[in-house]
Amino acid sequence: MSNQYQTQGYTVNDAGRRLIVDPITRIEGHMRCEVNIDEQNVITNAVSCGTMFRGLEIILQGRDPRDAWAFVERICGVCTGVHALASVYAIEDAIGIQVPDNANIIRNIMLATLWCHDHLVHFYQLAGMDWIDVLNALKADPRATSQLAQSLSAWPMSSPGYFFDVQNRLKKFVDGGQLGIFRNGYWGHPQYKLSPEANLMGFAHYLEALDFQREIVKIHTIFGGKNPHPNWIVGGMPCAINLDQSGAVGAINMERLNLVQSIITRTADFINNVMVPDALAIGQFNKAWSQIGTGLSDKCVLSYGAFPDIANDFSQQSLLMPGGAVINGDFKNVMPVDLADPQQIQEFVDHAWYRYPDDRLGRHPFDGITDPWYNPGDVKGSDTHIQQLNEQERYSWIKAPRWRGHAMEVGPLARTLIAYHKGDAATIESVDRMMSALKLPLSGIQSTLGRILCRAHEAQWTVGKLQYFFDRLMTNLKNGDLATANTEKWEPASWPQHCRGIGFTEAPRGALGHWASIRDQKIELYQCVVPTTWNASPRDPKKQIGAYEAALMGTQMAIPDQPLEILRTLHSFDPCLACSTHVLGDDGSELIAVQVR
Protein backbone atom coordinates (compact mmCIF):
# COMPACT_ATOMS: atom_id res chain seq x y z
CA MET A 1 0.00 0.00 0.00
CA SER A 2 1.47 3.32 -1.07
CA ASN A 3 1.76 6.41 1.13
CA GLN A 4 1.21 9.94 -0.14
CA TYR A 5 1.30 13.23 1.74
CA GLN A 6 2.21 16.92 1.39
CA THR A 7 5.21 18.46 3.13
CA GLN A 8 7.34 21.56 2.56
CA GLY A 9 5.77 22.18 -0.84
CA TYR A 10 6.35 18.63 -2.09
CA THR A 11 4.00 15.71 -2.70
CA VAL A 12 5.74 12.64 -1.31
CA ASN A 13 4.53 9.42 -2.91
CA ASP A 14 6.25 6.07 -2.40
CA ALA A 15 4.37 4.32 -5.20
CA GLY A 16 6.27 3.32 -8.32
CA ARG A 17 9.64 1.71 -8.86
CA ARG A 18 12.10 1.79 -5.97
CA LEU A 19 15.74 2.51 -6.77
CA ILE A 20 18.40 1.93 -4.12
CA VAL A 21 21.91 3.42 -4.16
CA ASP A 22 24.02 2.01 -1.33
CA PRO A 23 26.39 3.44 -0.26
CA ILE A 24 26.31 6.87 -1.85
CA THR A 25 29.54 7.99 -0.25
CA ARG A 26 31.25 8.06 3.13
CA ILE A 27 30.42 11.28 4.97
CA GLU A 28 31.27 10.80 8.62
CA GLY A 29 30.00 7.25 8.04
CA HIS A 30 28.21 5.60 5.17
CA MET A 31 25.13 6.81 3.32
CA ARG A 32 22.35 4.96 1.54
CA CYS A 33 19.71 6.58 -0.65
CA GLU A 34 16.43 5.11 -1.82
CA VAL A 35 14.05 6.83 -4.23
CA ASN A 36 10.73 6.06 -5.86
CA ILE A 37 10.24 7.07 -9.48
CA ASP A 38 7.01 7.32 -11.45
CA GLU A 39 6.32 6.23 -15.02
CA GLN A 40 8.12 9.33 -16.35
CA ASN A 41 11.20 8.45 -14.24
CA VAL A 42 10.59 11.45 -11.97
CA ILE A 43 11.58 11.06 -8.31
CA THR A 44 8.47 11.21 -6.10
CA ASN A 45 10.00 10.02 -2.82
CA ALA A 46 13.53 10.14 -1.43
CA VAL A 47 14.95 8.44 1.64
CA SER A 48 18.38 9.36 3.04
CA CYS A 49 19.93 6.85 5.42
CA GLY A 50 23.12 7.14 7.45
CA THR A 51 24.27 3.55 7.88
CA MET A 52 27.09 3.88 10.42
CA PHE A 53 26.87 4.67 14.13
CA ARG A 54 29.49 7.22 15.25
CA GLY A 55 29.29 7.21 19.04
CA LEU A 56 32.10 9.66 19.84
CA GLU A 57 29.79 11.50 22.22
CA ILE A 58 29.69 8.36 24.36
CA ILE A 59 33.45 7.84 24.13
CA LEU A 60 34.11 11.36 25.45
CA GLN A 61 32.11 10.97 28.64
CA GLY A 62 34.40 10.98 31.68
CA ARG A 63 37.46 12.21 29.75
CA ASP A 64 39.64 15.27 30.24
CA PRO A 65 38.04 18.21 28.35
CA ARG A 66 41.47 19.34 27.16
CA ASP A 67 41.71 16.12 25.13
CA ALA A 68 38.29 16.36 23.48
CA TRP A 69 39.59 18.09 20.35
CA ALA A 70 41.90 15.17 19.55
CA PHE A 71 39.01 12.71 19.65
CA VAL A 72 36.38 14.70 17.77
CA GLU A 73 38.89 15.72 15.09
CA ARG A 74 38.74 12.11 13.92
CA ILE A 75 35.08 12.50 12.98
CA CYS A 76 36.30 13.53 9.53
CA GLY A 77 39.68 13.38 7.81
CA VAL A 78 38.81 15.51 4.79
CA CYS A 79 37.48 18.62 6.56
CA THR A 80 40.31 18.02 8.98
CA GLY A 81 40.71 20.26 11.99
CA VAL A 82 37.29 21.88 11.95
CA HIS A 83 35.86 19.62 14.65
CA ALA A 84 38.93 20.28 16.78
CA LEU A 85 38.35 24.01 16.33
CA ALA A 86 34.70 23.74 17.40
CA SER A 87 35.81 21.63 20.36
CA VAL A 88 38.41 24.06 21.71
CA TYR A 89 35.88 26.87 21.24
CA ALA A 90 33.38 24.90 23.37
CA ILE A 91 35.83 24.06 26.16
CA GLU A 92 37.16 27.63 26.28
CA ASP A 93 33.61 28.95 26.42
CA ALA A 94 32.83 26.61 29.31
CA ILE A 95 35.95 27.35 31.37
CA GLY A 96 36.15 31.05 30.49
CA ILE A 97 39.47 31.14 28.65
CA GLN A 98 40.50 34.17 26.58
CA VAL A 99 42.92 33.38 23.75
CA PRO A 100 45.59 35.78 22.42
CA ASP A 101 45.02 37.69 19.19
CA ASN A 102 47.65 35.61 17.38
CA ALA A 103 45.88 32.39 18.37
CA ASN A 104 42.62 33.67 16.90
CA ILE A 105 44.40 34.76 13.72
CA ILE A 106 46.23 31.45 13.29
CA ARG A 107 43.00 29.52 13.88
CA ASN A 108 41.36 31.58 11.14
CA ILE A 109 44.32 30.87 8.86
CA MET A 110 43.91 27.15 9.57
CA LEU A 111 40.17 27.30 8.86
CA ALA A 112 40.60 29.37 5.69
CA THR A 113 43.26 26.94 4.48
CA LEU A 114 40.84 24.09 5.05
CA TRP A 115 38.08 25.85 3.13
CA CYS A 116 40.34 26.50 0.13
CA HIS A 117 41.63 22.94 0.15
CA ASP A 118 38.24 21.34 0.70
CA HIS A 119 36.47 23.38 -1.97
CA LEU A 120 39.16 22.54 -4.53
CA VAL A 121 39.11 18.84 -3.66
CA HIS A 122 35.33 18.77 -3.75
CA PHE A 123 35.05 20.63 -7.05
CA TYR A 124 37.57 18.47 -8.90
CA GLN A 125 38.07 15.16 -7.12
CA LEU A 126 34.70 14.58 -5.45
CA ALA A 127 32.15 16.17 -7.78
CA GLY A 128 34.03 17.09 -10.95
CA MET A 129 33.57 13.79 -12.73
CA ASP A 130 29.79 14.12 -12.36
CA TRP A 131 30.09 16.94 -14.93
CA ILE A 132 33.28 16.07 -16.86
CA ASP A 133 33.04 13.13 -19.27
CA VAL A 134 36.55 11.71 -19.16
CA LEU A 135 36.27 9.45 -22.21
CA ASN A 136 34.71 12.22 -24.31
CA ALA A 137 37.90 14.23 -23.76
CA LEU A 138 39.62 11.84 -26.19
CA LYS A 139 37.57 13.44 -29.01
CA ALA A 140 38.85 16.93 -28.26
CA ASP A 141 41.08 19.03 -30.50
CA PRO A 142 44.00 20.16 -28.28
CA ARG A 143 44.33 23.39 -30.28
CA ALA A 144 40.66 24.26 -29.76
CA THR A 145 41.03 23.30 -26.10
CA SER A 146 43.92 25.72 -25.79
CA GLN A 147 41.87 28.49 -27.37
CA LEU A 148 39.01 27.77 -24.97
CA ALA A 149 41.27 27.80 -21.91
CA GLN A 150 43.05 31.00 -22.95
CA SER A 151 39.71 32.71 -23.56
CA LEU A 152 38.73 32.01 -19.94
CA SER A 153 41.87 33.01 -18.03
CA ALA A 154 45.59 33.73 -18.18
CA TRP A 155 46.55 30.39 -16.59
CA PRO A 156 49.94 29.55 -18.13
CA MET A 157 49.37 25.80 -18.53
CA SER A 158 47.11 26.16 -21.55
CA SER A 159 49.19 25.58 -24.67
CA PRO A 160 48.08 23.16 -27.43
CA GLY A 161 51.10 21.01 -26.64
CA TYR A 162 50.13 20.78 -22.97
CA PHE A 163 46.60 19.58 -23.76
CA PHE A 164 47.96 17.20 -26.40
CA ASP A 165 50.20 15.62 -23.75
CA VAL A 166 47.31 15.32 -21.27
CA GLN A 167 45.10 13.76 -23.92
CA ASN A 168 47.86 11.34 -24.89
CA ARG A 169 48.30 10.29 -21.25
CA LEU A 170 44.56 9.67 -21.01
CA LYS A 171 44.55 7.70 -24.27
CA LYS A 172 47.32 5.40 -23.04
CA PHE A 173 45.37 4.95 -19.82
CA VAL A 174 42.20 3.98 -21.71
CA ASP A 175 43.91 1.85 -24.36
CA GLY A 176 45.63 -0.12 -21.61
CA GLY A 177 42.26 -1.12 -20.19
CA GLN A 178 43.26 0.16 -16.74
CA LEU A 179 40.79 2.97 -16.04
CA GLY A 180 41.28 2.69 -12.30
CA ILE A 181 39.20 5.28 -10.46
CA PHE A 182 37.43 6.18 -13.73
CA ARG A 183 36.43 2.59 -14.48
CA ASN A 184 32.82 2.73 -13.31
CA GLY A 185 31.79 6.21 -14.42
CA TYR A 186 28.64 6.72 -16.48
CA TRP A 187 30.64 8.03 -19.42
CA GLY A 188 28.43 8.90 -22.37
CA HIS A 189 25.39 9.52 -20.18
CA PRO A 190 23.04 12.03 -21.88
CA GLN A 191 23.38 14.45 -18.95
CA TYR A 192 27.04 15.07 -19.82
CA LYS A 193 26.80 18.36 -21.72
CA LEU A 194 30.38 19.68 -21.89
CA SER A 195 32.05 19.83 -25.29
CA PRO A 196 35.02 17.49 -25.89
CA GLU A 197 37.35 20.48 -25.49
CA ALA A 198 35.76 21.53 -22.19
CA ASN A 199 36.02 17.93 -21.00
CA LEU A 200 39.73 17.81 -21.87
CA MET A 201 40.33 21.13 -20.12
CA GLY A 202 38.42 19.94 -17.06
CA PHE A 203 40.30 16.64 -16.96
CA ALA A 204 43.65 18.44 -17.20
CA HIS A 205 42.66 20.70 -14.31
CA TYR A 206 41.47 17.66 -12.35
CA LEU A 207 45.03 16.30 -12.54
CA GLU A 208 46.53 19.69 -11.65
CA ALA A 209 44.23 20.06 -8.64
CA LEU A 210 45.08 16.55 -7.49
CA ASP A 211 48.73 17.59 -7.38
CA PHE A 212 48.21 21.12 -6.08
CA GLN A 213 46.03 20.19 -3.10
CA ARG A 214 49.12 18.67 -1.48
CA GLU A 215 50.72 22.11 -1.43
CA ILE A 216 47.85 23.92 0.28
CA VAL A 217 47.86 21.67 3.35
CA LYS A 218 51.48 22.53 4.08
CA ILE A 219 50.06 25.57 5.88
CA HIS A 220 48.46 23.12 8.32
CA THR A 221 51.76 21.36 8.84
CA ILE A 222 53.52 24.66 9.58
CA PHE A 223 51.03 25.90 12.16
CA GLY A 224 49.59 22.55 13.30
CA GLY A 225 52.45 20.10 12.87
CA LYS A 226 50.75 17.74 10.43
CA ASN A 227 47.87 17.08 8.07
CA PRO A 228 45.42 15.47 8.36
CA HIS A 229 44.48 16.07 11.99
CA PRO A 230 46.75 19.01 12.88
CA ASN A 231 47.41 19.87 16.51
CA TRP A 232 45.41 22.37 18.54
CA ILE A 233 45.34 23.36 22.20
CA VAL A 234 42.73 24.67 24.60
CA GLY A 235 43.83 28.26 25.18
CA GLY A 236 45.36 29.00 21.80
CA MET A 237 47.63 27.28 19.28
CA PRO A 238 50.61 24.98 20.05
CA CYS A 239 53.07 26.70 17.72
CA ALA A 240 55.99 28.69 19.05
CA ILE A 241 57.19 31.59 16.89
CA ASN A 242 60.81 32.71 16.80
CA LEU A 243 61.84 35.15 14.09
CA ASP A 244 65.56 35.38 14.89
CA GLN A 245 66.33 31.80 13.76
CA SER A 246 67.35 30.74 17.28
CA GLY A 247 65.60 29.15 20.21
CA ALA A 248 63.32 26.14 20.36
CA VAL A 249 63.68 23.49 17.69
CA GLY A 250 60.60 23.45 15.51
CA ALA A 251 59.60 27.05 16.20
CA ILE A 252 58.08 28.89 13.26
CA ASN A 253 60.67 31.19 11.67
CA MET A 254 60.73 33.57 8.70
CA GLU A 255 61.57 30.78 6.29
CA ARG A 256 58.36 28.98 7.25
CA LEU A 257 56.34 32.19 7.13
CA ASN A 258 57.68 33.02 3.68
CA LEU A 259 56.59 29.57 2.56
CA VAL A 260 53.08 30.27 3.87
CA GLN A 261 52.94 33.48 1.82
CA SER A 262 54.12 31.62 -1.27
CA ILE A 263 51.39 29.00 -0.85
CA ILE A 264 48.70 31.65 -0.35
CA THR A 265 49.79 33.42 -3.54
CA ARG A 266 49.73 30.20 -5.57
CA THR A 267 46.39 29.16 -4.09
CA ALA A 268 44.82 32.48 -5.07
CA ASP A 269 46.23 32.09 -8.57
CA PHE A 270 44.80 28.57 -8.95
CA ILE A 271 41.37 29.49 -7.59
CA ASN A 272 41.04 32.68 -9.63
CA ASN A 273 42.44 31.36 -12.92
CA VAL A 274 41.43 27.69 -12.87
CA MET A 275 38.63 26.83 -10.46
CA VAL A 276 36.34 29.83 -10.97
CA PRO A 277 36.57 29.76 -14.81
CA ASP A 278 35.93 26.00 -14.75
CA ALA A 279 32.86 26.47 -12.55
CA LEU A 280 31.51 29.06 -14.98
CA ALA A 281 32.26 26.75 -17.92
CA ILE A 282 30.27 23.96 -16.28
CA GLY A 283 27.48 26.45 -15.69
CA GLN A 284 27.44 27.59 -19.32
CA PHE A 285 26.91 24.04 -20.55
CA ASN A 286 24.50 22.98 -17.78
CA LYS A 287 22.08 25.86 -17.29
CA ALA A 288 19.18 23.43 -16.93
CA TRP A 289 20.69 22.37 -13.62
CA SER A 290 19.95 25.84 -12.24
CA GLN A 291 16.36 24.56 -11.95
CA ILE A 292 17.14 21.13 -10.51
CA GLY A 293 17.90 20.17 -6.92
CA THR A 294 16.43 23.25 -5.23
CA GLY A 295 15.21 21.27 -2.23
CA LEU A 296 15.08 23.44 0.88
CA SER A 297 17.38 26.18 -0.44
CA ASP A 298 14.47 28.46 -1.41
CA LYS A 299 12.70 27.81 1.88
CA CYS A 300 14.89 27.17 4.91
CA VAL A 301 18.65 27.80 5.18
CA LEU A 302 20.97 28.12 8.16
CA SER A 303 24.45 29.44 8.88
CA TYR A 304 26.14 29.94 12.24
CA GLY A 305 28.84 32.24 10.87
CA ALA A 306 32.62 31.92 11.08
CA PHE A 307 36.00 33.68 11.12
CA PRO A 308 35.87 35.93 14.22
CA ASP A 309 37.82 39.08 13.38
CA ILE A 310 38.20 39.94 17.07
CA ALA A 311 39.63 37.34 19.43
CA ASN A 312 37.07 35.86 21.85
CA ASP A 313 34.20 37.73 20.16
CA PHE A 314 31.69 35.53 18.34
CA SER A 315 29.07 38.21 17.78
CA GLN A 316 27.76 38.90 14.30
CA GLN A 317 29.72 42.15 14.33
CA SER A 318 32.95 40.15 14.65
CA LEU A 319 32.23 37.25 12.29
CA LEU A 320 33.47 37.90 8.75
CA MET A 321 31.24 35.11 7.44
CA PRO A 322 27.81 36.17 8.70
CA GLY A 323 25.32 33.81 10.29
CA GLY A 324 21.55 33.68 10.40
CA ALA A 325 18.49 31.63 9.54
CA VAL A 326 15.72 31.94 6.97
CA ILE A 327 12.47 29.99 7.18
CA ASN A 328 9.46 29.75 4.88
CA GLY A 329 11.37 31.44 2.06
CA ASP A 330 11.32 34.85 3.77
CA PHE A 331 14.77 36.05 2.75
CA LYS A 332 13.90 39.61 3.73
CA ASN A 333 13.94 38.43 7.34
CA VAL A 334 17.27 36.80 8.21
CA MET A 335 16.83 35.83 11.85
CA PRO A 336 19.56 35.60 14.49
CA VAL A 337 20.68 32.18 15.70
CA ASP A 338 21.25 31.42 19.39
CA LEU A 339 22.80 28.00 19.90
CA ALA A 340 22.01 28.12 23.63
CA ASP A 341 18.28 28.65 23.11
CA PRO A 342 16.48 25.31 23.70
CA GLN A 343 13.61 26.49 21.49
CA GLN A 344 15.82 26.99 18.44
CA ILE A 345 17.90 23.86 17.84
CA GLN A 346 16.36 20.51 18.71
CA GLU A 347 17.15 16.99 17.55
CA PHE A 348 14.45 14.40 16.94
CA VAL A 349 14.87 10.63 16.84
CA ASP A 350 11.48 9.12 16.05
CA HIS A 351 12.78 8.14 12.58
CA ALA A 352 16.36 7.45 13.72
CA TRP A 353 17.92 4.46 15.47
CA TYR A 354 18.10 6.19 18.86
CA ARG A 355 15.86 6.40 21.90
CA TYR A 356 14.63 9.31 24.00
CA PRO A 357 12.32 9.04 27.03
CA ASP A 358 9.67 10.50 24.69
CA ASP A 359 10.57 10.07 21.03
CA ARG A 360 7.94 12.54 19.91
CA LEU A 361 9.78 15.44 21.54
CA GLY A 362 12.99 17.04 20.34
CA ARG A 363 15.90 17.75 22.65
CA HIS A 364 18.35 20.63 22.69
CA PRO A 365 21.99 19.41 22.48
CA PHE A 366 22.62 20.43 26.10
CA ASP A 367 19.89 17.93 26.99
CA GLY A 368 20.98 15.51 24.28
CA ILE A 369 20.96 11.76 24.70
CA THR A 370 22.98 9.38 22.55
CA ASP A 371 21.23 6.07 23.20
CA PRO A 372 21.56 3.86 20.11
CA TRP A 373 18.59 1.58 19.42
CA TYR A 374 18.76 -0.31 16.16
CA ASN A 375 15.16 -1.13 15.35
CA PRO A 376 14.53 -1.05 11.59
CA GLY A 377 10.95 -2.20 11.99
CA ASP A 378 9.01 -3.70 9.10
CA VAL A 379 11.54 -3.75 6.25
CA LYS A 380 12.06 -5.84 3.15
CA GLY A 381 14.81 -8.31 3.85
CA SER A 382 16.17 -8.81 7.35
CA ASP A 383 17.53 -6.62 10.15
CA THR A 384 21.09 -7.42 9.05
CA HIS A 385 20.46 -7.32 5.28
CA ILE A 386 17.90 -4.64 4.54
CA GLN A 387 16.71 -4.78 0.95
CA GLN A 388 14.39 -1.80 1.31
CA LEU A 389 14.01 0.67 4.17
CA ASN A 390 10.69 1.58 5.71
CA GLU A 391 10.69 5.36 6.05
CA GLN A 392 7.41 5.22 7.97
CA GLU A 393 9.48 3.87 10.87
CA ARG A 394 13.13 4.32 11.94
CA TYR A 395 15.60 4.26 9.07
CA SER A 396 18.87 6.11 9.83
CA TRP A 397 21.77 6.46 12.26
CA ILE A 398 21.45 10.23 11.77
CA LYS A 399 19.22 12.27 14.04
CA ALA A 400 16.86 14.92 12.66
CA PRO A 401 17.94 18.42 13.79
CA ARG A 402 15.44 21.22 13.37
CA TRP A 403 15.67 25.00 13.78
CA ARG A 404 12.47 26.30 15.33
CA GLY A 405 10.80 23.15 14.04
CA HIS A 406 12.05 23.45 10.44
CA ALA A 407 14.34 21.20 8.43
CA MET A 408 17.22 23.35 7.17
CA GLU A 409 19.87 23.27 4.45
CA VAL A 410 23.40 24.21 5.49
CA GLY A 411 26.61 24.64 3.49
CA PRO A 412 28.09 27.05 0.93
CA LEU A 413 24.75 27.74 -0.77
CA ALA A 414 23.06 28.48 2.56
CA ARG A 415 25.97 30.69 3.66
CA THR A 416 25.96 32.57 0.38
CA LEU A 417 22.22 33.21 0.55
CA ILE A 418 22.46 34.40 4.16
CA ALA A 419 25.38 36.74 3.38
CA TYR A 420 23.71 38.01 0.20
CA HIS A 421 20.43 38.84 1.90
CA LYS A 422 22.20 40.41 4.89
CA GLY A 423 23.75 42.85 2.45
CA ASP A 424 27.36 41.64 2.41
CA ALA A 425 28.84 43.71 -0.41
CA ALA A 426 31.55 41.24 -1.47
CA THR A 427 29.04 38.38 -1.69
CA ILE A 428 26.53 40.45 -3.65
CA GLU A 429 29.19 41.55 -6.15
CA SER A 430 30.55 38.03 -6.63
CA VAL A 431 27.19 36.28 -6.97
CA ASP A 432 25.73 38.93 -9.28
CA ARG A 433 28.83 38.73 -11.47
CA MET A 434 28.60 34.93 -11.74
CA MET A 435 24.88 34.85 -12.49
CA SER A 436 25.21 37.69 -14.98
CA ALA A 437 28.02 35.87 -16.79
CA LEU A 438 25.74 32.83 -17.07
CA LYS A 439 22.68 34.96 -17.96
CA LEU A 440 20.76 33.30 -15.14
CA PRO A 441 18.42 34.89 -12.59
CA LEU A 442 19.46 35.04 -8.94
CA SER A 443 16.95 32.27 -8.16
CA GLY A 444 19.04 29.95 -10.33
CA ILE A 445 21.63 29.76 -7.57
CA GLN A 446 19.15 27.80 -5.44
CA SER A 447 19.92 24.55 -7.22
CA THR A 448 22.39 21.73 -7.74
CA LEU A 449 24.39 23.95 -10.10
CA GLY A 450 24.15 26.78 -7.58
CA ARG A 451 25.87 24.71 -4.90
CA ILE A 452 28.78 24.17 -7.28
CA LEU A 453 28.97 27.88 -8.12
CA CYS A 454 28.79 28.88 -4.46
CA ARG A 455 31.82 26.76 -3.68
CA ALA A 456 33.77 28.58 -6.36
CA HIS A 457 32.58 31.92 -4.97
CA GLU A 458 33.51 30.87 -1.43
CA ALA A 459 36.95 29.64 -2.47
CA GLN A 460 37.64 33.04 -4.02
CA TRP A 461 36.30 34.87 -0.96
CA THR A 462 38.23 32.64 1.43
CA VAL A 463 41.63 32.94 -0.19
CA GLY A 464 41.24 36.71 0.14
CA LYS A 465 40.57 36.28 3.87
CA LEU A 466 43.54 33.90 4.10
CA GLN A 467 45.79 36.70 2.87
CA TYR A 468 44.07 39.19 5.19
CA PHE A 469 44.70 37.12 8.31
CA PHE A 470 48.27 36.31 7.32
CA ASP A 471 49.00 40.02 6.86
CA ARG A 472 47.59 40.69 10.33
CA LEU A 473 49.76 37.96 11.82
CA MET A 474 52.89 39.39 10.21
CA THR A 475 52.04 42.86 11.51
CA ASN A 476 51.70 41.51 15.05
CA LEU A 477 54.97 39.62 14.80
CA LYS A 478 56.84 42.65 13.48
CA ASN A 479 55.46 44.61 16.43
CA GLY A 480 56.89 42.05 18.84
CA ASP A 481 53.66 40.21 19.70
CA LEU A 482 54.61 36.51 19.63
CA ALA A 483 52.00 35.10 22.05
CA THR A 484 50.03 32.13 20.68
CA ALA A 485 48.48 30.62 23.83
CA ASN A 486 47.01 31.54 27.20
CA THR A 487 47.72 28.84 29.80
CA GLU A 488 46.41 30.68 32.87
CA LYS A 489 43.52 28.23 33.26
CA TRP A 490 45.29 25.14 31.98
CA GLU A 491 45.21 23.39 35.35
CA PRO A 492 41.83 21.80 36.19
CA ALA A 493 42.00 23.16 39.73
CA SER A 494 41.25 26.60 38.27
CA TRP A 495 37.97 25.47 36.67
CA PRO A 496 34.44 25.77 38.08
CA GLN A 497 32.97 22.57 39.50
CA HIS A 498 30.33 22.61 36.79
CA CYS A 499 30.33 24.58 33.57
CA ARG A 500 28.92 24.38 30.05
CA GLY A 501 30.14 25.74 26.75
CA ILE A 502 29.24 25.98 23.08
CA GLY A 503 31.67 26.00 20.19
CA PHE A 504 30.51 26.80 16.69
CA THR A 505 31.99 27.50 13.31
CA GLU A 506 31.31 26.75 9.66
CA ALA A 507 32.86 23.62 8.21
CA PRO A 508 33.19 23.63 4.42
CA ARG A 509 29.97 21.62 4.30
CA GLY A 510 28.02 23.85 6.68
CA ALA A 511 27.02 24.75 10.22
CA LEU A 512 28.95 22.90 12.92
CA GLY A 513 28.19 23.03 16.63
CA HIS A 514 29.68 21.32 19.69
CA TRP A 515 28.02 21.43 23.11
CA ALA A 516 30.04 20.41 26.19
CA SER A 517 29.15 20.04 29.85
CA ILE A 518 31.99 19.65 32.37
CA ARG A 519 31.54 18.44 35.93
CA ASP A 520 34.30 17.75 38.45
CA GLN A 521 36.93 18.43 35.76
CA LYS A 522 35.62 15.70 33.44
CA ILE A 523 33.29 15.71 30.45
CA GLU A 524 29.77 14.98 31.65
CA LEU A 525 28.01 15.43 28.30
CA TYR A 526 29.22 16.13 24.78
CA GLN A 527 27.05 16.56 21.70
CA CYS A 528 28.00 17.36 18.10
CA VAL A 529 25.51 18.50 15.49
CA VAL A 530 27.46 18.39 12.24
CA PRO A 531 26.61 19.64 8.73
CA THR A 532 25.72 16.15 7.53
CA THR A 533 23.28 15.81 10.43
CA TRP A 534 21.39 18.78 9.04
CA ASN A 535 21.57 17.90 5.36
CA ALA A 536 21.21 14.10 5.56
CA SER A 537 18.47 14.35 8.17
CA PRO A 538 15.70 11.74 8.13
CA ARG A 539 12.05 12.61 8.67
CA ASP A 540 10.76 14.08 11.93
CA PRO A 541 7.44 13.65 13.82
CA LYS A 542 5.80 16.07 11.35
CA LYS A 543 7.05 13.91 8.43
CA GLN A 544 9.22 16.79 7.19
CA ILE A 545 11.94 15.51 4.88
CA GLY A 546 15.61 16.51 5.15
CA ALA A 547 17.70 18.61 2.76
CA TYR A 548 19.09 15.68 0.74
CA GLU A 549 15.66 14.13 0.42
CA ALA A 550 14.03 17.41 -0.62
CA ALA A 551 16.74 18.19 -3.20
CA LEU A 552 16.04 14.94 -5.05
CA MET A 553 12.28 15.46 -5.25
CA GLY A 554 11.00 16.11 -8.76
CA THR A 555 14.27 15.20 -10.48
CA GLN A 556 13.78 13.41 -13.79
CA MET A 557 16.22 10.60 -14.49
CA ALA A 558 17.32 9.90 -18.04
CA ILE A 559 18.45 6.33 -17.32
CA PRO A 560 17.29 5.12 -13.88
CA ASP A 561 19.86 2.33 -13.79
CA GLN A 562 22.58 4.96 -14.26
CA PRO A 563 21.60 7.43 -11.51
CA LEU A 564 23.96 10.26 -12.45
CA GLU A 565 21.28 12.79 -11.52
CA ILE A 566 21.12 11.44 -7.95
CA LEU A 567 24.90 11.56 -7.60
CA ARG A 568 25.14 15.08 -9.01
CA THR A 569 22.66 16.50 -6.54
CA LEU A 570 23.91 14.62 -3.49
CA HIS A 571 27.54 15.35 -4.38
CA SER A 572 26.68 19.05 -4.68
CA PHE A 573 26.28 19.01 -0.88
CA ASP A 574 29.94 17.88 -0.68
CA PRO A 575 30.53 14.19 -0.01
CA CYS A 576 33.88 13.25 1.44
CA LEU A 577 35.62 9.94 0.80
CA ALA A 578 35.59 7.61 -2.20
CA CYS A 579 33.74 4.33 -1.85
CA SER A 580 32.11 1.67 -4.01
CA THR A 581 28.48 2.30 -4.84
CA HIS A 582 25.99 -0.36 -5.83
CA VAL A 583 22.70 0.38 -7.57
CA LEU A 584 20.03 -2.13 -6.59
CA GLY A 585 16.62 -3.02 -7.93
CA ASP A 586 13.65 -3.18 -5.58
CA ASP A 587 14.31 -6.88 -5.01
CA GLY A 588 17.79 -6.14 -3.69
CA SER A 589 19.58 -7.49 -6.75
CA GLU A 590 22.55 -5.48 -7.94
CA LEU A 591 22.00 -3.64 -11.21
CA ILE A 592 25.32 -1.89 -11.61
CA ALA A 593 28.27 -0.72 -9.52
CA VAL A 594 30.00 2.64 -9.82
CA GLN A 595 32.87 4.34 -8.08
CA VAL A 596 31.63 7.40 -6.27
CA ARG A 597 34.22 10.15 -6.54
Predicted regions mapped to residue ranges:
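Metal/cofactor-centered catalytic core regions of large enzymes
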Residues: 2-597
